[in-house]
């Protein structure tokens, strides 16, 4: 994978680097952390000499050898699946422990659908960026001095490693209708920075959304047009505009402040086909699909209605959509839930109530059935492990995860048969024996 050769063909330096990887593969990445990778490799070479596996002369020669790895544009690693892979790692760690996970020689077949995973990632990114751009421009990610060669300085600015569509760039000059930019040069495996200086332009039309600054953002740029957004020395993210052949055109980007998550599941088997737990795994490994507990809000209402349909109500049953007051307890203000429209519509059928997501009907329904019954159904669907039996919970005031809620909706799509989320299809040990299989 790293050197595109068999084990017996490896040099001492190459073998030493591979031996250095298991402790912390990401810390010794040959591209992103080249200096640390070479230092760790050389330490391993030194230990090989100390323990008599190689001579001192061989050690010195091997340490001087540059770290050259085969860079692949395609291969087994899917950047879009980092959140999925990390969730699988957590489950394996919980099941087999650290020794079993890293030394057990396990072969794991997951439920991941690579095509769906790529679509999921792009869809979430598109939604987050659209929402974030509506909030306005927050300014550059950094600023550098432009005196002399800007390449080495720009190369030191940390960029997102798992958003390959984006590049870091420094603004070289700004006119009324466009900004001239210089792209971040790649670091060489042998150390140093590429001497090539790639340039491009960001036309005003590709940064027009940024002419409105976000609330609280400091306006560093002055003037009109492109100069109202960017200044020379600004370090920003850009994305290549496809289909332009006469010159390299880029569009202005910014990392969204808003977070989100997406889960795609086979509703009949519970197999998780795709998971995206955030905009960038490199920026934040926190998986918002499995680890973030959030209020489901109105997406919880179908389960209140499911409890009602199981307990004497029908789709044509009438429930009053009108003002309702709930005593919250001694010293607490009276709770008066309202519909989103802030209107009431009188007696309405259950079908209309769920179609229009009526708050007052849902609360009145939960009050009539009793919240203990709603709590029981919430647990049976796997949305909550525990839920306080208070009426606001019928409007989704409790907390759950995207994965739990997806599993609950999958149960509905599966005709009411319970669906359990699964990331792993099969696990085999080093001898090929199946030690786990998801039924």
Predicted segments, located by residue:
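Beta-lactamase-like hydrolase cores
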Residues: 11, 127-139, 157-166, 222-229, ...
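Conserved catalytic neighborhood of penicillin-recognizing serine enzymes
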Residues: 8, 75-78, 268, 313-374, ...
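A short, well-structured edge-of-sheet supersecondary motif
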Residues: 10, 167-186, 253-282, 381, ...
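Conserved active-site-proximal loop/helix segments of enzymes involved in bacterial cell-wall
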Residues: 106, 386-390, 411-439
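Short active-site loop at a secondary-structure junction
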Residues: 217-225, 255-260, 283-303, 315-322, ...
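Beta-strand/loop nucleic-acid-binding surfaces
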Residues: 189-229
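Non-catalytic, structured segments within soluble enzyme domains
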Residues: 1-185, 365, 372, 376-386, ...
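Active-site SXXK
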Residues: 48, 120, 269-270, 293-321, ...
